[in-house]
Structures are given as structure tokens and as C-alpha cells.
Amino acid sequence: MNNVRPIRRALLSVSDKTGILEFAQALHAQGVELLSTGGTAKLLADNNIPVMEVSDYTGHPEIMDGRVKTLHPKIHGGILARRGIDEIVMEQNAIKPIDLVTVNLYPFAETVAKPGCTLADAVENIDIGGPTMVRSTAKNHKDTTIVVNAKDYGRVIAEMQANNGSTTLETRFDLAIAAFEHTAAYDGMIANYFGTMVPAHSNDECHDDSTFPRTFNSQFVKKQDLRYGENSHQKAAFYVDTQIDEASVASAIQLQGKALSYNNIADTDSALECVKEFEGPACVIVKHANPCGVALGANLLEAYDRAFKTDPTSAFGGIIAFNQELDAQTAQAIVDRQFVEVIIAPKVSQAARDIIAAKANVRLLECGEWNTKTTTLDYKRVNGGLLIQDRDQGMVNLEDVKVVSKRQPTAEQLKDLMFCWKVAKFVKSNAIVYAKDGMTIGVGAGQMSRVYSAKIAGIKAADEGLVVENSVMASDAFFPFRDGIDAAAAAGISCIIQPGGSIRDEEIIAAADEHGMAMVFTGMRHFRH
């Protein structure tokens, strides 16, 4: 069966004019008759590209301030007509076939993101005719070609040039999928926006904004299929959120190494998000989504060396993240010292790349620099539902903490407390972190009782010969009993940072005073499950 369809007439109507002139010129060069609307038609005419206004083609003017332009039988009949079936109906109604439609939609997302956007502004940027044409063309992909993204202009022209002015069914079907994805995302954004409008009274349109819509719509695009999931019997794929513009594992470029696994991606995300918390040279080593070593240094090499010393055993087969360009010295130290699954950094020097290339299986990622963090949502799937929350971007500075003990922390201890608190945010609850001089010396993660996390952190430090005496400790949540304080004191901890908020806070503070320890409250918890 012949699956190519010639393009003799095209309708172009775009809000984003990127590349449209070149596309229209190429279509004209192929002998395609061009129809267009409003601003797009004017742009083409101003550049001497022959074009017919849709209103002239239909014999009906745009009405209602442009709200009704393309909603006409001559447009949708021309798009939806089945070639070889509907010709008689088309002739009876003076309808000509439209073989290609190029549409991108009113900028709804950009409009509602602007400060001071009103509901009226949002409403006027809800496209009606555009999505209708997109869906009509995509539905009739057997005969018509839909283009919703400027990146596909060149592809369509190249195929027409290779097929005597025609497109193939394979291409039309692929473009139809992209079109339905496009309209689904567009409608989802509109539904989310309106869904956050909470009526103050039953007869009101809207008054109050809710953070979370009545129904939640989000679209993720598949980046790659994965060999398997968390375990080898599970199928998996990696999807990315194209609305997020931030340095991340999702946007990172893989420079070398084996394909990333499901667990690689999850662990790399944990490592990268943790290292983003620090300004000076820093290194984070993660194993099973928990930091097993975090450190600051005068340079990356020192930061890596100190992070590795926290727990060399757990660092084996781990993920290493840096917050500055990976240099040759640090790369050589990693290659000489340990087996590593993934290394990620904002940038990797050519010299470092050459060194790591000797370990062909090591996955080396470059994620780009980061300046700000995007305000996004976190999702957690439960059986039959989805938990959604704000991303945990809670920050605590020195001026935010409250000293609750008799003993005052020193300036150096306060620096270590801030460092330790940042690390604890990325450790699975119950989380306890011991640190000294900008270096973790023990991490207790994921225990069902807080006291055992405290004990494990001490055991880890002792196993590596790290001195706990006069170190500081961070706890991601309050201490329900004094036993965690007693365990920390026995290990040699001299200062503690924790949220506070327990009904036994007075008893906890008294325990710290009894041991001669300094203690500060943050008033903020960092549970991580």
C-alpha cells in the first residue's frame, strides 16, 4: 500500500514564530499553497511569501476579537477529509484538502507564570482553534501531516524533498503522537491552573488559590529505557520533566561509561542534590541513596580525600558528586583509589576525561552549573494513590538557630553544625550525622529508633579510626528520649543541632547540660523516607 501523501496545501498558524519563515519559504519552494491567520499571515506577507488569509479562504471574517478564526467546515473538512472516500462531500461543499497543518498554541504557561497574571489574562490565552486543528490533523494522520514543534520543520522539508513533495505514514504517525502529547500537556496545564482556584462561595468563579489542583496533571518524556528496575525482575524506564530547567541527573550529559541503571539514577540524584547545598569545594559520596561521606576542602582533591575517609568500605561502588569542575588530580585519585559507579560534576576538564577514560565502564556525567533551585513538587507513589508535596528546600542559617543549652557553641562548632545539618537533610530517617572540621566522620541512617542511628554513627567513626571527641552531631528530627543524647555523649560529641519540638524537650536539654554539651534548635525538621 502506498503510504506517502503529497502536500499541496498547508495551514500555518503559530504563536511562537521561531523558524516559521524558513519553513514557509521551503514549503513555497515545493509548490505548496499556504493558508495562514493573523500575525503569522502578516509575517509571511511582509517577507514576500505568497499566503492567503484563512478568512479570505473561508469567506468568513475573524470574529469576537479573534476568538473565532479557524473553526469553520472549510478548514476542518479539509483537514479531516478521508482521501479516496470524502471527495464528493468536499466538492459539494467547496472544501479543498489541507495536507499539512503547523500550529503551536497560545502561551498559556508563560502567561500564568508572569507576576500579576489575572484570571482574565489566563482565559484569553487559552487556545481553542489551535488544539482543535492539531487534534483533527493528528486524528487524520493517515492522510495529513501535523507539526507542533519547530524542531520538526527541517525533518518535514527533508522528507518532502526525498519523496517528491510527500510525507510517509511513519513520519505522520510519529508527528501525530507528538501532537497528542502536546495537546495533553496543554490541557493539563490549564486544568491544573483552574484546579487551584478554590471558590469562596458556590456562586463565585474563584477567589482563593490552593497550592494543589483538584486533579493533578503532569507530563514526563521518556529519555531512555533501562535494562531493569530496582531489581532485575522489574522493567523500568527513565522519564524527564521538560518543564524543569535546572542542573540535574535528568538533564545531565553522559560523557562515557555503561548505560545508567535505575539505581544509578536514583543514587546520582541523591548525591547531586546534596552537593548542591555547599558553596566551597565539596564532595558527596552516596551508597544506596544515603551519603556515606561528605566533606569540604580547600580544593576538590582535598574534599574527595576527606569524604572518602569517612567510610571507605561503603564508598566502594558508590556515586561521587562534586560542585565544581572535576580536575585531573581529583580524577586520578578516584581512579587509583576506588571502584566507582558514577561520577557527576557541573563540568569535567578534558584532562580529567582522559584519565577516567582508562576506566571505560565508569559512568561520567556533566550536569552544568547551577545558580538557583527550581521550585518543584516531590511525588511519592502509594498503592492506589500519589502523595504530592513541595520539594524540601528549607534552609537554616546561623541567625535562625536557637541555643537552648547552658553551654554556648563556639564559632567553629557553629560552622560544623551548619555543615552537618545540610548533610542530615539527605540521609534517610532516622538520620544522625557526626561531623568535624567540615567532614562527616560517621553517618547513622534509616534506623527505626533514633538512638540506634546515633550509635551506628559512632561505630562507623570508630571503625575508621576517626576521632569523635569534640565533634558535632545533627539529627533530622527531634529526640523523643534522652537516650540519643547519652549515646552521643558516650561517643564524644560536644555539640548537637536538632529541630526541637518534642514533649520531652526539657528533659533532652537537661541531658545535654548534664553532659556539658551545647545544643541548638532549628525549628525545622528534615524527615526523608
Curated annotation (Swiss-Prot):
Residues 1-148 form the MGS-like domain. Its EC number is 2.1.2.3, 3.5.4.10. This is Bifunctional purine biosynthesis protein PurH. One of its GO terms (molecular function) is IMP cyclohydrolase activity. Belongs to the PurH family. InterPro entries: AICAR_Tfase_dup_dom_sf, Cytidine_deaminase-like, MGS-like_dom, MGS-like_dom_sf, PurH-like. GO terms for cellular component: cytosol. NCBIfam families: PRK00881.1, purH. The gene is purH. It catalyses: (6R)-10-formyltetrahydrofolate + 5-amino-1-(5-phospho-beta-D-ribosyl)imidazole-4-carboxamide = 5-formamido-1-(5-phospho-D-ribosyl)imidazole-4-carboxamide + (6S)-5,6,7,8-tetrahydrofolate; IMP + H2O = 5-formamido-1-(5-phospho-D-ribosyl)imidazole-4-carboxamide. It comes from Shewanella frigidimarina (strain NCIMB 400).
